Amino acid sequence: MYLSPEQVALVGQVFESFVLEHHQKEIAQILTEKYEDAHYSLVVNAMTLFEANMEIGEYFNAFPNEVLPIFDNALRRAAMSFLQSCSEKQTLVMKQNFHARITGLPVCPELTREHIPRTRDVGHFLSVTGTVIRTSLVKVLEYEQDFMCNKCKHVVTVKADFEQYYTFKPPITCSNEEGCNSSKFTCLSDSSTPASCRDYQEIKIQEQVQRLSVGSIPRSMIVVLEDDLVDSCKSGDDVTVYGVVMQRWKPLYIDTRCDLEIVLKANYIAVNNEQPCGVVINEEVRKEYEGFWEKYRNSPLEGRNEILASLCPQVFGMFVVKLAVAMVLAGGVQRIDSAGTRVRGESHLLLVGDPGTGKSQFLKYAVKITPRSVLTAGIGSTSAGLTVTAVKDSGEWNLEAGALVLADGGLCCIDEFNSIKEHDRTSIHEAMEQQTISVAKAGLVCKLNTRTTILAATNPKGQYDPEESISVNVALASPLLSRFDLVLVLLDTKNEDWDRIISSFILESKGCPRKSDKLWSMEKMKTYFCLIKNLQPKMSQDANVILVRYYQLQRQSSCRNAARTTIRLLESLIRLAEAHARLMYRDVVTTEDAITVVSIMESSMQGGALLGGVNALHTSFPENPREQYRMQCELLLERLGLQKLLDKELQRLDRQQNEDSLESDHGESASNISCNLVGHKVHSDSAMEETCSTNETFSSPDATRKTIPDILDMTKSDDTISKGTITPAEQNRAIRTQSKSSSKHNTQSLAGGHLSENHLTRCSDKSLGWFDSLQSVQMSPISKLGEGCTAEKLQPAVLPVLAEGSCHPDKEVVDLVGNKSEVLQKSGSSPVGTERHLSNRIVTEHVSKKWQNLNKNSLCGKTGSNMTSLQSENSGSHTVCSSGPLHSTPGAPWKRKKIIAQVEKETKAELLDPDTQARLVQLARFSFKQHSKLVHLPGGKTDIASIAQNHEDQPDQKLTPSDRLNKLDRILNNVDKASNSVKGLKQQDTLAQENPPKQTVLAQQSNSISNAATACVHEKKLNEGSDSRKVSSSTLAKLARFSFSPPPENKALEASKETLISSRAAAPSSKRKCFQLEPSSDKTTMSSKFLFSTDLDDDELDVDWEVEIKRNKRTAT
């Protein structure tokens, strides 16, 4: 079916009037061009045309091949009418080759396709989106030929048949009106004019991979370009082709199958590289991002971290990796030096890590948010697949683009990078540095652009060895590694906290996934990274000084990599600094950008001259970015020797912090006023002081320390603790979230069992935000003290105060289960406000009952006086400055006075007990010697001297040195009085030592027992003796078996022993590493195998002591 002449006239008239009304300026511009024979296009929007006349739309969709020539003729007539109506005819020249290019089809499945058309689409005008994978050479196409009749000399014009590959079919008979029926013609192609020829090119487009369904292989099809559409695109471009789907076949032969293929004859082609698909950047979008950075004007690092948290949110933590990926995606500024050489602005990143560390997740996310990107794996990539391939098609060689060429101007992600073969891997050296690929294949010599960012991931070769170089671990050559700006190592080392947090994060996201309001969507991230690509930041003088000094330090480092510490390192630093400035939405590279880049480079395997390599896997988001940056400034600038820049930067940080605090105070006051207007009750200043506390410590010496209202002075906090406002789980969670540095988000902490509103919200949330400060500050939570803790248990647990400089944030601070605990903080006087509360700075240590029983008298005697003196001294103090850890232990209540008096009575009665005196005598027989081979027992300091030392170290007891000596003399007098009651026991010991049984002699010959073993046995004897006054025969026999044959008694030796005991009792500050029972001889023998024999059993030691005495007497006689 064809259009009738009336329909053809209607279509021509309507289109001519439409063009004169809507595209008059474009026609005037075309007429001003100089070349008359060139081809000119006029782009017409189909939606606007169809709205003007729907009948034309129906004709166009039904007969596109017939309507398009009508549009061209109507456009030529419109240009002629415009030229005639124009007053300035001198500057306008009429053109013969006008083409109407239709674009902007309605978005519907009938007209818009993302997949390759099929047979049913033949003859329809469609728009197809794809990627150009191959372009052929531009050819000259003869589309018309003239044939002359040999009889009547009539000339017949024949057009080439598109469906038969533009072949010409000569006329069968002469079409002369005079009635010549000749069938013989002569071709006049030799005398054909250039007007009968046109440019011709074929390209191949492929379906976009991201638009395919699961398991689909991308298909491709040929697109025919003519006239001015030739060379409008290149390999790797994302294009949208508007054209007519047609079919063509080669000439038919007998007994051969027809080779039919579907092609797209293009009417218009739009390249989508300049405007990324799905991204719209307008003034409204710019204002949205400018408002975001205005919100974080005083704390821009927090705004940056919010963007980083939205980058690959399915991966927990990994702060350094996310920052590096974001900087690589932002990219640097490309520039041309004075010699005309182009210096690349794109950065390259290599992720080296164990399997399962999330490398591929970052690659997949980066491909999604980058408009022009290619994702490939090294295991199936060759040199031709990565660069360019020469393909022979239709008798000629063509170049087909590889992954790097397809990613020109975008991102190329290569997974399993070390799986690429060695000779294929060297082919990308030029693509990474010069960003071009030189090709000389099959007679084709050309150079293609590869201005792409390479993000690669690889596994180490075997197990990663930190002692070896990165080149040995990943089996990559140094020239290739030096082209990567950053090489981050992700080692999956043993870390229980990290494993627990990761498992909780994965299970939480699988069970009940929820989206956070702060996280940016993928479309917003995609738009932001497209927007910041337009920024051109300039280097500042301070940033130049820092980067140059760091480069010089890397060059001077003794362990430097000669292949890396070249001028490429300095260029990498500049590119990354510009990328961070883009990420921060700035036009100038500041000191903040330079410091961040140096810290990231130190975490990379390409750096390490200042701090050494860092495992980038176990890095979490900082709780306070400003304080972390302050620490980085102090650490890096001091080592770089830039003190002036350090002072300048610290002043800027203090100024930002002051402005931030002023704004927060203003906001809080405004909220308080609004609460008053509504009718809420506002607490008085005293109530606020009693219920809120600020417990912050800054890491830098220049930071301001804030005072802390002590909990003991808060009388109203008793009710909140007793009512159980906060559960122990919430309190432990709150303690765990506190970090060393302060910020506006955590300025209010625990106070009398209360948390601030913001802090309590974060703690009560089931998310894993409290783990963010795990890497920077590791603290063990302190268990809450029970209310039943008495004063006797709390009083001796006050530990010695260490110096302020001994506090280290990266070590475990407090351990309350069985080990000695030390509070690494410098505290002033510990104020005591009430009788029922202890300071939250006291950490208790659980000791044995024997130690408590021995000290009840001294402790209970001083409790009342000490409490009274402390109350009178510190009743007016309310604040304490602390530089230690930010966690605190809840106070425990005191026992009432009646209970204390009862304990004093029981203690006095127990001291008068002869059994207690006997134990004191046994305790006095201990002697202490240092020995390097003995193991330090954790229960040390159980002698009288250590007890006196503990009493002196307690800050709450106000004892003078004379009082301590008098107390020790009273204890020794009790020992002398009770010595008569154990005189018989000593005689038995001496008798057993002089006459050892046969089994003892055998034990001495086979394996000698150490003094430490004897000490442990004697201590066990003391513990058993606390239940009864008599010593069992089995225990005495056991002691006899482990004794040694004594030499003759020496009185001078006994005198020296007594002198040693008295001197050590008078000097409580002496330090002992181990202790043992006093041997009966001067010579001691150490065991060579075991401290304790494993062959002896308790049944063998169970011997009747009286029978042994009689047996020894018989042998002696």
Swiss-Prot record:
Residues 686-756, 868-893 are annotated as: Disordered. Residues 691-702, 722-750, 868-886 have a biased composition (Polar residues). Signal peptide: none annotated. Its main location: nucleus. Its EC number is 3.6.4.12. Component of the MCM8-MCM9 complex, a complex involved in homologous recombination repair following DNA interstrand cross-links and plays a key role during gametogenesis. The MCM8-MCM9 complex probably acts as a hexameric helicase required to process aberrant forks into homologous recombination substrates and to orchestrate homologous recombination with resection, fork stabilization and fork restart. In eggs, required for MCM2-7 loading onto chromatin during DNA replication. Probably not required for DNA replication in other cells. GO terms for molecular function: ATP binding; ATP hydrolysis activity; DNA binding; helicase activity. The gene is mcm9. The keyword Cytoplasm does not apply. It comes from the Eukaryota. GO terms for cellular component: MCM8-MCM9 complex; nucleus. One of its GO terms (biological process) is regulation of DNA-templated DNA replication initiation. This is DNA helicase MCM9.
